[in-house]
């Protein structure tokens, strides 16, 4: 067991009343994060050494979706503890984006799709569900 807290970044990209979610592959192997295949998640992953949270958010979104994001704000932070893993997840909202949406890491997410905030899939990745629930409660 690894006794280390890691920092993860989750990015809600907003477009009107829609948010971008990626489908985590059913065959996805545990890549070090919290293991929940066949769920829908926001883009984002681990922060790297010497990288700000906004740099991480921009890098991860670009690596995963091919989108460039801007006008970022920190929304919340949460402790995500599962299966002997502990992540502090920084939840970031991106209010602007540009580029052509594309699946960049098909071994991790096999689809990216825009969902209305009031019509989300049931099988949300647990940290994503927490993020959305908190966001909707504050609106």
Regions found by a protein language model. Name each.
Residues 1-41, 69:
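N-terminal strand-loop-strand
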Residues 47, 69, 78, 96-97, ...:
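Hydrophobic pocket-lining residues within nucleotide cofactor-binding pockets
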Residues 40, 93, 102-134:
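NUDIX/MutT-family hydrolases
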Residues 19, 27, 80-82, 120:
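Surface-exposed, flexible loop/turn segments at secondary-structure boundaries
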Residues 3, 80-84, 106-107:
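A short beta-turn/loop motif at secondary-structure boundaries
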Residues 15, 78-101, 134-136:
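Active-site-adjacent beta-strand/loop module that shapes the phosphate/pyrophosphate-binding cleft
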Residues 42-76, 92:
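The catalytic Nudix box helix
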């Amino acid at each position: 067991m690894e006794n280390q807290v890691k920092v993860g970044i989750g990015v809600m990209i907003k477009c009107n009343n829609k948010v971008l979610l990626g489908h985590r592959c059913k065959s996805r192997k545990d890549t070090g994060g919290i293991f929940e295949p066949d769920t829908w998640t926001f883009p984002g992953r681990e922060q790297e050494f010497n990288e700000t949270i906004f740099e991480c958010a921009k890098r991860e979104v670009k690596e995963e979706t091919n989108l460039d994001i801007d006008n970022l704000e920190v929304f919340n932070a949460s402790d995500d503890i599962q299966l002997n893993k502990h992540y502090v997840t920084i939840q970031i909202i991106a209010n602007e984006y540009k580029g052509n949406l594309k699946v960049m890491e098909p071994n991790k997410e096999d689809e990216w799709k825009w969902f209305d905030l009031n019509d989300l899939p049931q099988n949300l990745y647990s940290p994503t569900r927490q993020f959305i629930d908190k966001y909707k409660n504050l609106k």
